[in-house]
Amino acid sequence: MSMLSDNFDFLLLSGCYLEMISFGVRMTRLDFSRPQTFPGVSPYTVSFCVEAGLKYRIGSVVGQRNFADSSTSAPLLDFLLMDVQSVEEVKPATLQITFCTGDKILVEPDDTGDYESYSIYLDSGDVIVI
């Protein structure tokens, strides 16, 4: 399993909101964006493609995305258009995204360390693979 680098920018979602959530076979994609500042200027975007653990807390509801149970995907839709408050590493390679409401998404690495857990597609075109 790869780890986050020492110079990982935890402000990468500063000023962003969750614009879109996509579900695929064994994958959840979270697309974040900053509001467009001027016409004709492409907005800042960052995407997380999660293939391993994805947990969430919305109000008092705590859940985990289970690829075999599509009903575990529905609560994630409540995060749409929420502003990001912070991103922090709560355990090695485990990122917690906290929203302005206090609700959270936890992106976790693969327990076995044998597979890619998640990829972060940065606005610059760089990709971070964990």
Task: Enumerate the language-model features and the residues they cover.
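Surface-exposed, interaction-prone regions used to assemble/regulate multi-protein complexes
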Residues: 1-130
